[in-house]
Amino acid sequence: MAIERTLSIIKPDAVAKNVIGQIYARFEGAGLKIVAAKLVHLSRGEAEQFYAVHKARPFFKDLVEFMISGPVMIQALEGEGAIAKNRELMGATDPKKAEKGTIRADFADSIDANAVHGSDAPETAAVEVAFFFPGMNVYSR
């Protein structure tokens, strides 16, 4: 398997629960390295731009409102098969359907407040990492 990078966002609900460290421990326990990270409070414009792919979807407005409701922890993860590994750690989008022991099963409250975001493919990962971390701010280790 190839070394990949993926974007992960710990959403406002999980940041408010003070579980960033527990989520980071899961990333590292799965062999993923944090190669860039920052705690930010997204502006409406940033959230709308980042989630523009969902603009026509009925949940877009609520998603943007949720993502600007509090700080988020954004990180680029690197490792063998990082995209699939991160998605496995996250669990199903709906925490009620997420497998026991996944981030969403353990820390999310609803399909809307579902604790984390993760890139779904190599192409989106490249775009999403570049959105938050220009190349000079990502460091392989």
From Swiss-Prot:
Gene3D superfamilies: Nucleoside diphosphate kinase-like domain (3.30.70.141). ATP binds at residues 11, 59, 87, 93, 104, 114. The active site is at residue 117. SMART domains: NDK. Its main location: cytoplasm. CDD domains: NDPk_I (cd04413). It is found in: Cytoplasm. Homotetramer. Major role in the synthesis of nucleoside triphosphates other than ATP. The ATP gamma phosphate is transferred to the NDP beta phosphate via a ping-pong mechanism, using a phosphorylated active-site intermediate. This is Nucleoside diphosphate kinase. It comes from Methylibium petroleiphilum (strain ATCC BAA-1232 / LMG 22953 / PM1).
